[in-house]
Design a protein with these regions (language model features):
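Transmembrane-helix signature of polytopic, membrane-embedded enzymes
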Residues: 16-17, 91-92, 112-134, 167, ...
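Short helix- or helix-capping micro-motifs
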Residues: 20-23, 128-133, 160, 181, ...
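Transmembrane-lumen/periplasm boundary regions of multi-pass, lipid-linked membrane glycan transferases
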Residues: 43-54, 69-74, 78-79, 85, ...
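Transmembrane-helix motifs of polytopic, lipid-linked glycan transferases
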Residues: 95-119, 157, 161, 295-298
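Specific aromatic-rich, kink-prone transmembrane helix
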Residues: 111-115, 150-167, 176-181, 343-347
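Membrane-interface transmembrane helices that cradle and orient dolichyl/undecaprenyl
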Residues: 119, 158-174, 184, 206-209, ...
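Short acidic/glycine- and proline-prone juxtamembrane loop motifs at membrane-interface regions
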Residues: 137, 143-150, 333
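C-terminal luminal/periplasmic domains and tails of membrane-associated envelope-modifying transferases
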Residues: 373-376, 384-539
């Protein structure tokens, strides 16, 4: 037994897992505890939950266990709270929750290996595990206490067990599959789409002329376990149904473009399918790994056509169905496509496995370097944190600082090492549709401001995507950036992990952990009338 465990492939897998752990666990306090990811604030702000004292209280929508937040499922919050209360008691809830997220991402690595080995070979399994380990967004989201790492783990485990059902002809795997689908639903309502993989197992068994009574019996067990687990882990999606449906309707409306809050209009005019293929996945999965994955997909499809290997369907059906759905959404957040990563990793692993060792020795270091370039983000202070320190050191107290609404104003709250200073903050309502009143108010606010600080490209990139709504606001930004509005750019804090600007990537890939911060000083002090005249000179 010991001899079987200590072999070259197992040692390589252990090295890959340890390397993945370093990439995911290093500097979980990357933002100095400022909650710079808005979804993290959502979890922390709703973390004041506790066990109800009575059954009546438990069943009530007003229960102390109800997080009163249904944009995401409650499972991650419950996991974070339990871990912080009983395991990692010396840590803050923020760091504990990031640690749990990172651990789920680490646990996914051996699962990718097992899937690759189950369908292909140990070589494919190892290469696939390495590709996933080095995937940029899996490293990034391991540093956030959001649902993504948990969902990717559950997806990978469901994929693995769905394959085992068919390969081993073992129906008992439908028991954990039903439970895991319930977990996925409790993590995020999107997790219900993972049912595609167990359903594929059922279909394969059905057409293989298995005992139909047996198939329907286990199908019933699977559905019952999914429902029971989902209700147990997310009870208030039933007990507080109206609240749940209301928030889900809003979130679905945002996703499909029925509702367009300011933080989504950056996707106005983005081309379905091409946007994630060009402006998301090369950055989030890897500049080299992503094209390798597409080559691997072609190899897998050809292999299925030639050999009719039914197990390959598990690597084709879900990702293509999911992408055909999510790639057409109005809001194309980078995180939506992280559910493709287990499949992309295996596709890329298949492509790499076809190469001679000499080419692997050339490509693998390039894949590692790409990941390490991004990893540097967590080796240096966050740009917003650094900018805030600079503000406390270099801007006099009582100055008026303007910022954009719907983005994080700077400076952040003072740290122990910063000087004690107070500033007056003004938020410019640039997202309001252009009107005479808006431009007049904008001009007044700018005229009295000593500084204007842009803490990410989120707002002005959104504005530039909507010229019909914001012709004058676009001209305002053009004047600002060209130094013609009386404001001079005196400082920029940016960290581009790949040494060149990643502004072409989806905004959400950049704005949380490495946003460019621009600081403008009002040197000429134009009057409101002068500013209005400048902004109004546009067609």
């Amino acid at each position: 037994m010991k001899k079987n465990l200590i072999n070259k492939n197992n040692i390589l897998l252990l090295i890959i897992i340890l390397f993945g752990a370093i990439l995911r666990l290093y500097n979980l306090n990357w933002d100095n505890g400022y909650f710079l990811h808005p979804d993290e604030r959502l979890y922390i702000n709703n973390s004041n939950i506790s066990i109800p004292k009575t059954l009546e209280e438990f069943l009530s929508p007003d229960s102390s266990l109800n997080p009163n937040m249904f944009y995401y499922g409650p499972l991650p919050l419950y996991l974070y709270k339990i871990s912080n209360s009983y395991i990692f008691t010396s840590m803050s809830l923020l760091i504990t929750s990031r640690l749990v997220s990172a651990l789920f991402s680490i646990f996914t690595i051996p699962l990718i290996f097992l899937i690759g080995r189950k369908i292909f070979s140990e070589k494919v399994g190892l290469l696939s595990a390495l590709i996933f380990t080095l995937s940029i967004e899996s490293i990034q989201y391991a540093h956030f206490n959001t649902t993504e790492s948990i969902l990717v783990f559950l997806l990978s485990l469901i994929l693995f067990l769905s394959i085992k059902v068919v390969k081993e002809n073992n129906f008992f795997y439908f028991i954990p599959l039903g439970i895991l689908l319930g977990f996925s639903y409790a993590a995020k309502i999107t997790g219900l789409v993972f049912v595609i993989m167990p359903s594929l197992s059922f279909l394969i068994l059905f057409f293989s002329k298995e005992n139909l009574k047996k198939i329907f019996f286990w199908g019933f067990i699977f559905l019952i376990l999914t429902a029971i687990t989902g209700v147990i882990l997310a009870p208030y999606q039933i007990f507080d149904l109206s609240h749940f449906l209301r928030e889900q309707e809003y979130m679905q409306g945002v996703t499909y473009g029925k509702y367009k809050p300011p933080f989504t209009i950056i996707y106005e005019g983005s081309i379905p399918y091409l946007f994630p293929l060009i402006q998301i996945l090369p950055f989030t999965f890897g500049f080299l790994a992503f094209p390798l994955s597409l080559i691997g997909l072609i190899i897998i499809i050809k292999k299925y056509i030639n050999q009719k290997n039914i197990y390959l369907l598990f690597l084709i059906i879900f990702p293509l169905l999911y992408f055909s759905w999510a790639g057409n959404w109005y809001a194309k957040y980078a995180r939506y496509y992280i559910l493709l990563f287990p499949f992309l990793a295996i596709w890329a692993g298949v492509a790499l496995s076809k190469l001679k060792n000499i080419y692997l020795l050339l490509l693998i270091p390039l894949l590692i370097i790409n990941a390490l370039f991004f990893f540097r983000i967590y080796m240096f202070p966050n740009t917003r944190v650094t900018a805030s320190h600079w503000i406390y050191q270099n801007i006099s107290s009582n100055k008026i600082i303007a910022s954009e609404h719907w983005d994080d104003p700077l400076p952040l709250s003072r740290s122990d090492n910063d000087q004690v200073k107070t500033f007056t903050s003004i938020q410019l309502a640039v997202y309001d549709p252009d009107s005479k009143e808006k431009i007049e108010k904008l001009a007044i606010d700018l005229s009295i401001s000593d500084y204007f600080i842009i803490s990410s490209r989120r707002v002005y990139f959104s504005i530039f995507q909507n010229p019909q709504t914001y012709p004058q606001t676009i001209h305002f930004y053009q004047l600002l950036f060209n130094g013609k509005l009386g404001f001079e750019k005196i400082k920029e804090f940016s960290f581009y992990p790949f040494f060149v600007s990643d502004n072409f990537a989806d905004e959400t890939f950049q704005s949380y952990d490495h946003p460019p911060v621009l600081i403008f000083q009002n040197n000429k002090k134009f009057s409101p009338e002068q500013i209005i005249n400048l902004i109004s000179k546009t067609n």
